[in-house]
Amino acid sequence: MAVMQLENGRTYRDIGAIASQLAVLNVQIDRLPMRENPAVRELLAQDILNVTEKQQILAAFQSEFEQFKRADGCQWCDLKVLHAGSQQIYALMTQSNRTHTHTDAEVLHILAGECVFGFVYPNGSQVQLMLQAEEYIKVPANTEHWFYLTPSLYLKAVQYYTTAQGWVPQYTNRKLKIKN
């Protein structure tokens, strides 16, 4: 269940209320429930996945990819698999937990685990949004934000891309006012 925390400490737990709060940024958030698929659920429960297992999971979400392709111009997707033992986890945490923008939209479908996005409103105030399994977010291009994992250090999510260059962070170096 998504949880949004404002700078003043107020929290929202209703996805509709959260979507309303993020509308000023054109950030889209919604539930995207998974179809019942025991084989995929079993794979999602594993920490480490080989290439074939990752492809099986992506194949199970092909219809979602086709939907994002039509709606958002996504060209390809990959599976982000992060856990405490991941080689790339600390590099990712260092790279993404600072305020930045991207030249493309950032589209992420959480399959397992949880993560936090933070956003900077036009007036400079900041909010944080924790996302969990079966939630989807689309952060428009050039939206100032940051991203980090919760203390569980566990996330499996499908990332959708429109270009290869679009996800390169452009750091804004804004000081974070809110971060748990």
Q: Each predicted region: which residue ranges?
A:
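N-terminal leader/capping segments at the start of a protein or of a new domain
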Residues: 1-71
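Conserved short histidine dyad/triad with adjacent acidic residue
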Residues: 76-103
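Short, conserved beta-strand element in jelly-roll/cupin
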Residues: 101-121
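Conserved metal-binding segment of the jelly-roll/cupin
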Residues: 131-151
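Double-stranded beta-helix
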Residues: 150-180
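Structural signal for conserved beta-strand scaffold positions within catalytic alpha/beta enzyme cores
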Residues: 5, 31, 78-81, 159
